[in-house]
Amino acid sequence: HSSRGVSAGRGIRCNGEVPLATAFSLAATPAVRHPPAHMASLRTLLVLGRVSNLPTVWSNCLAGWLLAGGGEGSRFAWLCAGATLVYVGGMFLNDAFDAEFDTQHRRERPIPSKAISREAVWGWSAALLAGGTGMLGWLGRDSAILALQLLACVVLYDAFHKSLAWSPVLMASCRFFLVLTAASAGVRGVDGLALWTALVLGCYIVGLSYLARRESAPGLIRYWPLVLLAAPLVLAFIVNDGFFREKALLASAIVGLWALRCLRATLWQSPPAIGKTVSGLLAGICLVDLLAVADQPPHVSVWFLGCFVLALLCQRFVPAT
């Protein structure tokens, strides 16, 4: 019997026999494999697409659309659908490019956690970006040109955002061209107000994205980029006068108070909760859009506030960052 002793710590006998319990344990342990693309869980796809931010995309579309005079409801629905595909495709592409980084630092993300293969994510992103850009391009020549510029910014940001210090500008460019694409689909097209609105939204996104970079690359938080979060308030005061200025000031107060509430978690809390701040500021994009159309009838506000609340609710189930 001594010649058939158990090898210490291994549970396998020296004569090569495997104990029955160990055999069942080995048989019951499946090999770790990536599920096929069509088998990826719905939650995996929702997390990859960061769908909790989609209400902010629809809000951008509505703001640009209204600034250009609106138009047929069917065109607006088509616009939102195309923008949705581009956004989700861009988020998929972001994870595909970041797979190596996530494997080292964020193993809970879908690709390093084996919830879906990197190859499948590449395929999803290509299909979504192509489909969304095509849908936006169908809205007209100007829309097609702007949609291609939007696509270029999305791809450049996803490919280089880890290596470029000024990548927040690329992220801001994505929202800039989204608003202009939405305006180009309206009856009046892109005008000066739509251009300025897209620009100040871009400033807000630069400040937001600067903070988001600190979430994955901790370091000293500088205050000056956060000043850009106030850019929409300045434009609202300049372009609205009389009765509309009162509405703009009210909307500005809402935006400002929300931004301060979000920043409190990072600037006046130890340790800083940067993710919480960024998520709140992302939802606040809907309030910035509301500020851009302060001269619209009161019932229009309901749609932007609805997008804001929906974004916050979705963040309870799917991370925004």
Mark where each language-model region is.
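C-terminal membrane-associated helical module and adjoining short loops/tails
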Residues: 24-26, 35-46, 126, 176-321
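Residue-level signature of transmembrane alpha-helical entry/exit and packing/kink sites
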Residues: 44, 53, 57, 75-79, ...
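Short, amphipathic, aromatic/basic-enriched membrane-interface segments that mark the entry/exit
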Residues: 44-52, 95, 111-121, 139-140, ...
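Membrane-embedded alpha-helical segments that form the functional core of polytopic membrane enzymes
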Residues: 58-97, 129-137, 144-157, 196-207
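Multi-pass membrane catalytic core of lipid/isoprenoid biosynthesis enzymes
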Residues: 81-82, 99-154, 169-172, 178-180, ...
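Acidic (Asp/Glu-rich) catalytic motifs at the cytosolic membrane interface
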Residues: 83-113, 120, 208-219, 318-319
